[in-house]
Each structure stands twice: as structure tokens, then as C-alpha cells.
């Protein structure tokens, strides 16, 4: 098994910690909030309020299920537009009250169904990109599994983007890439090697800012590492003047 195929397998492992796991293990007193105030509540995106080292924060993330029944309720971690609108509602609320935002990302991509398109999937994603680029509070995004396409990017326009060691981040799935390029989805591993989807490759290109180690660590130790890094980096980001924070975020994405 090549390194990239191993990363693909581990990134998609159903046993990985989910957004709700991290929300309850890293933060104190997490309280989930529901609904986009327009259409419905999307189970594929969860979010709410919590405390980190005594400071109020907003936590938002894409939630996959841990079994078939849970996955059906969570739409296999593929958000509908109402999920992205719920996330934006919580981010604007965080901006109003001066709370830092932490997002967790694990999705193959936004849901491509007819209903999602009819309800404005593209608009919902685009609006998140626009609003996050100018959100007046610190944002840290963490990829905890798959980071697929615009569905992942809609929660990843952040001051810092981190990846766990065995996760992936790409414009689309390797299977989709292979199907488009070669009309053969079975060449997914070959496609993944061309796409440069691993944490190490993306760190070298400056697309991600930090890699959270996983190899040789228990889940509880990984949680502790993320928590310590979040406390350190949020404190650092909050110390920056607002104009500098927003300009650095803008320049971070313009350099691509």
C-alpha cells in the first residue's frame, strides 16, 4: 500500500473522532444550536457554543455518522445548503459577540442532489466564502478526515488551516478526478498521487499551516495536542489588530 492510499483509507475510516467528539472532548459546556432560520436543520453540520480555557467560542463542523442509521441521519457528512446557512448564522452570531470560531471538517463534498441545487447549494457555499473572508473574529479550521471540494472550503476560509496527519484535502475526490481525467474511477490512487492531497504535501505548499501528529498517539493525546494548540493560536490571533487579522487572512488565500 502506497503512502497516499494509506492516507486515503485512514482519512475515510469510520472510527475517526467526529466533530461532536472533538466538541465535547476539547471544549467545556458545549451546547448545540440548530437550524438555519430559513428552511430546516441539517444534521450534516453541527455547531454551537462552548468554552475553551474559560473563553467563549463558537464551534462548527461537519458531522459524519458512526453507523448506518447515524450516517443516514447525517447524510453521510454531505451538507445541504441549509447546513451551510446554519454555519453562517452561527459565525455571524460569533462575530456579533466577539467569539473566536473553530471549525472541524470531514466531508467528501457538499450534497449534489437536485433538491440541494434547487435550494441554492452553490449560493450558500459562495456566501460562506465571502462572509468568512471578512469575519471580524479569529477563525481556525481543522481537517479531521476528508476535506473534499467546495463543501470543505465553505468552512475553511480561516486565519489558519490545520490538518491531522492522516487526513486529505482536495478539490474533489480522487475517484472523481480519475473519472474525469481518464474515465476510470479505479485509478483513484494514481489520481491522488498527482493531486497532492496529503497533509505533508499541502504543508510544503503553504496551503495548510500546521499538521497535528497522529502516528503513535492515542486519541486522548491528539485531543490534548489540538486543545493546547488552539489555546495558543487563538490567544495570538486575538492580540492582532483587526485590520491586520483581516488583511493577513485575505493575503493568505490570494497567494494561491
Curated annotation (Swiss-Prot):
The keyword Membrane does not apply. Its EC number is 2.1.3.15. Pathway: Lipid metabolism; malonyl-CoA biosynthesis; malonyl-CoA from acetyl-CoA: step 1/1. One of its GO terms (cellular component) is acetyl-CoA carboxylase complex. NCBIfam families: accA, AccA_sub, PRK05724.1, PRK12319.1. Acetyl-CoA carboxylase is a heterohexamer composed of biotin carboxyl carrier protein (AccB), biotin carboxylase (AccC) and two subunits each of ACCase subunit alpha (AccA) and ACCase subunit beta (AccD). This is Acetyl-coenzyme A carboxylase carboxyl transferase subunit alpha. It comes from Streptococcus pyogenes serotype M5 (strain Manfredo). The lineage of its organism: Bacteria, Bacillati, Bacillota, Bacilli, Lactobacillales. The gene is accA.
Amino acid at each position: 500500500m502506497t503512502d497516499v492510499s494509506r492516507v486515503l483509507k485512514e482519512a475515510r475510516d469510520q472510527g475517526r473522532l467526529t466533530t461532536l467528539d472533538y466538541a465535547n472532548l476539547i471544549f467545556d459546556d458545549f451546547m448545540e444550536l440548530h437550524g438555519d432560520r430559513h428552511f430546516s436543520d441539517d444534521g450534516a453540520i453541527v455547531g454551537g457554543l462552548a468554552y475553551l480555557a474559560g473563553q467563549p467560542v463558537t464551534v462548527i463542523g461537519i458531522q459524519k455518522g458512526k453507523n448506518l442509521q447515524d450516517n443516514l441521519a447525517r447524510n453521510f457528512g454531505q451538507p445541504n445548503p441549509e447546513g451551510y446557512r446554519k454555519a453562517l448564522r452561527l459565525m455571524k452570531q460569533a462575530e456579533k459577540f466577539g467569539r473566536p470560531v473553530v471549525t472541524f471538517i470531514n466531508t467528501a463534498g457538499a450534497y449534489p442532489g437536485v433538491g440541494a441545487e434547487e435550494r441554492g447549494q452553490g449560493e450558500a457555499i459562495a456566501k460562506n466564502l465571502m462572509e468568512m473572508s471578512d469575519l471580524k473574529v479569529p477563525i481556525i479550521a481543522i481537517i479531521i478526515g476528508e476535506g473534499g471540494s467546495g463543501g470543505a472550503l465553505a468552512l475553511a476560509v480561516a486565519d489558519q488551516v490545520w490538518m491531522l496527519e492522516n487526513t486529505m484535502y482536495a478539490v474533489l475526490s480522487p475517484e472523481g478526478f480519475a473519472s474525469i481525467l481518464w474515465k476510470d474511477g479505479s485509478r483513484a490512487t494514481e489520481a491522488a498521487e498527482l493531486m497532492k492531497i496529503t497533509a505533508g504535501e499541502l504543508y510544503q505548499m503553504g496551503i495548510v499551516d500546521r499538521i497535528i501528529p497522529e502516528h503513535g498517539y492515542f486519541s486522548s493525546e491528539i485531543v490534548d495536542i489540538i486543545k493546547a494548540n488552539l489555546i495558543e493560536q487563538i490567544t495570538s490571533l486575538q492580540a492582532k489588530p483587526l485590520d491586520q487579522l483581516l488583511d493577513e487572512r485575505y493575503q493568505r488565500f490570494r497567494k494561491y
